[in-house]
Amino acid sequence: MKTKHLRLMQRAYVILFFCFMYLPIAYMIVFSFNQSKGYALFTGFTLKWYTSLLHNSAILSALRVSLEVALISAVIATVLGTAASLGIASMSRKSRLVITNITYIPVVNPEIITGISLMLLFVAYQRFSEGVSWLPDTIMGMPTLLIAHIAFNVPYVIFNVTPKLKQLDIKLYEAALDLGCDPRQAFFKVILPEISPAILSAFLICLTYSIDDFMISYFNCGTVETLPIAIYSMTRKKVSPEIYALSTIMFVVILTIILISNAMESREYHRDQKALRGEDVK
């Protein structure tokens, strides 16, 4: 009897937890289709708020900036993070532990501290460049935004790719060298195919975090406006149903990216399990 009550309490807790997490999002999605501007009573279904987004030049401009920054920073961060992971994997155990702990600091560091510290660095550069003729007078704007996004994305790539490298059988790489491959060929034919799911998953994570970031972007964007900053500016005046529609689209896009990333990781896990059991892996 006690076990039955305990299970009921556990289920009730899980249900309450998910309601607490997702009811506000569900409420927002429902009222993004509301006919009226009010958010207390649903008066009818409409798509006009989604249509009006397509004619909002400020939102479209901010969306373009966010996508450009997310794609460019995700690609660069993925390349740098993968290269760093290869270097970390080749270190001794003690050195690898030290570098891993150092890399972990930006992940646990509050975003506001990261944003302000990067801003101070860019301001210091700007003051230094005033006395150097061949340096740009200012880089605040798209350059600083890209650097900031790359900086906070690289650790996530390292933590995603390094575990996969640890699982890699180094004998496969050595066998490729023995069979006549040079180090570059062995990397592209043996190592890269094995870690490519982790690399792609890391890229999707970087893309998600970059699109979603507000705090670090806010301090380092200059006059450039990303989508989260544009939404923040809109909410300071009034909460329009357009914001509900825009937030719903962002939620669906980010959720899709996360689901794709999780599906890839799950597929890779089952593939590894089949390989361990000696089954045919396709």
Residue spans for each PLM region:
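Membrane-embedded alpha-helices of multi-pass transport/permease systems
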Residues: L23-A26, V30, V79-A83, I116, ...
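Transmembrane alpha-helices
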Residues: Y13, F18-I25, A151, V157-K164, ...
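Short membrane-interfacial helix/loop motifs at transmembrane-helix boundaries
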Residues: L23-S57, L121, N220-G222, A275
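Transmembrane-helix boundary motif in ABC transporter permease subunits
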Residues: M1-R7, I72-T103, I116, L120-V123, ...
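C-terminal transmembrane helix and the adjacent membrane-cytosol boundary/short C-terminal tail
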Residues: K2-A12, T162-L177, F187-K189, Y244-K282
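Membrane-interfacial helix termini and adjacent extracytoplasmic/periplasmic loops
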Residues: G38-A40, L47, I112-I150, R184, ...
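Interhelical loop and adjacent transmembrane-helix boundary motif
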Residues: K2-R7, Y50-A58, I211-E268
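Non-cytoplasmic
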Residues: A26-K37, V157, A198-Y232
